[in-house]
Amino acid sequence: MNKFIVFEGIDGSGKTTQAKMLAEKLNAEYTCEPTTGKIGRTIREVLSGSECKKETLALLFAADRVEHVSEIEKMLQKSHVVTDRYVYSSIIYQTMQGISKEFIYSINFFAKIPDIVVILDVDTEEALKRMEFREKEIFEKIEFQKKIKQEYHKIAELKCSKFEPTYGFVMVNTTGKTPEEVFNELFNKILDKIPDII
């Protein structure tokens, strides 16, 4: 049976690189949030600095995810699916903006439960160095990223009962490691939990 794998972590932790490496290793479909669809493009405009109420942004993410989940279901019929960000990003980022978890849970009630979630950890300073040449988004300020990092630790340690992955969470620290070193570590951790994934 094909697996649904999610990558999470602060900006600059290496999610996109590692998600693509895993997709290639497993011959899986790679996807991401926000998506490249109409709603996803609107979200990217807001993240780049356009004005938007926090509740509207949360609803946009949920609406984009409705479309995304539909695509994920189709892709899972043919192969494993690896996504760069998912509902856990909404739980963390939107609650950090002052929106209640209950609101986030309610507007994401449809979200498909992943088989496993890989959380990539990294020193905040190293993450910011990695992002020096990227366009900055509204969520990329250092203090904010430190708080986000703490929230990811809470999700991994205390569990996220509403969207608990079938095989749980895996956390890998990427600080000072090459992409290959990170990949070997996370892939072995995934194999420990899901031996039949390959």
Swiss-Prot record:
It catalyses: dTMP + ATP = dTDP + ADP. Pfam families: Thymidylate_kin. ATP binds at G9, I10, D11, G12, S13, G14, K15, T16. CDD domains: TMPK. Its EC number is 2.7.4.9. The keyword Nucleotide-binding applies. Keywords: ATP-binding, Kinase, Nucleotide biosynthesis, Nucleotide-binding, Transferase. GO terms for biological process: dTDP biosynthetic process; dTTP biosynthetic process; dUDP biosynthetic process. The keyword Nucleotide-binding applies. GO terms for molecular function: ATP binding; dTMP kinase activity. InterPro entries: P-loop_NTPase (IPR027417), Thymidylate_kin-like_dom (IPR039430), Thymidylate_kinase (IPR018094). It comes from the Archaea. GO terms for cellular component: cytoplasm. Belongs to the thymidylate kinase family. NCBIfam families: DTMP_kinase. This is Probable thymidylate kinase. It comes from Methanococcus vannielii (strain ATCC 35089 / DSM 1224 / JCM 13029 / OCM 148 / SB). The lineage of its organism: Archaea, Methanobacteriati, Methanobacteriota, Methanomada group, Methanococci.
